[in-house]
């Protein structure tokens, strides 16, 4: 507490004692280590282990962040879906550089991907869209993401209207809904350590291989 008995965030601290990260723990390909950590996050029953903070930048250099769910990953990149009229999609159209952060607090871990985002093909988007629950498909039609609305009731009324409309048959893919693949060229792994001596390793793509360096915490 401060002199005025106000809540002081500077008083909040803890030690990171869940273990370290050594070079011998690393894999040649960062995606293999990411997959291992992601599976461990799932096994630890972390809430939303696929949630990632997506950072983009507007034309004025103003950064924006939001939480989005990872939906696929492989050597080609990491995939997420969104409304193409959203702020992030519009910013990526102007500047494809992007950062993805996975914050696994309960394991004292985080992973950061840096790269460029590119639009998915309509076929890829369509395949995923129809794998979603029908109500989620309808929800994609309802929201003009980031637009201003007068009340939540506007969304709920539109949802009920469209649910009736699409009661029979498949829900068509909205033209304004799509996805991005993040082709990454840098991945940093962070593991909390005692006395704030955290372990950090960064992978950077060099031609067809990955260069690995330890970073000071």
From Swiss-Prot:
Its cofactor is FMN. GO terms for molecular function: FMN binding; pyridoxamine phosphate oxidase activity. Keywords: Flavoprotein, FMN, Oxidoreductase, Pyridoxine biosynthesis. It is an enzyme of class 1 (oxidoreductase). The keyword Oxidoreductase applies. Pathway: Cofactor metabolism; pyridoxal 5'-phosphate salvage; pyridoxal 5'-phosphate from pyridoxamine 5'-phosphate: step 1/1; Cofactor metabolism; pyridoxal 5'-phosphate salvage; pyridoxal 5'-phosphate from pyridoxine 5'-phosphate: step 1/1. It catalyses: pyridoxamine 5'-phosphate + O2 + H2O = pyridoxal 5'-phosphate + H2O2 + NH4(+); pyridoxine 5'-phosphate + O2 = pyridoxal 5'-phosphate + H2O2. InterPro entries: Pyridox_Oxase, Pyridox_Oxase_CS, Pyridox_Oxase_N, Pyridoxamine_oxidase_dimer_C, Split_barrel_FMN-bd. Substrate binds at residues 13-16, 71, 128, 132, 136, 196-198. The keyword Oxidoreductase applies. Its EC number is 1.4.3.5. One of its GO terms (biological process) is pyridoxine biosynthetic process. Binds 1 FMN per subunit. FMN binds at residues 66-71, 81-82, 87-88, 110, 145-146, 190, 200. Catalyzes the oxidation of either pyridoxine 5'-phosphate (PNP) or pyridoxamine 5'-phosphate (PMP) into pyridoxal 5'-phosphate (PLP). Belongs to the pyridoxamine 5'-phosphate oxidase family. HAMAP family: PdxH. Homodimer. NCBIfam families: pdxH, PRK05679.1. This is Pyridoxine/pyridoxamine 5'-phosphate oxidase.
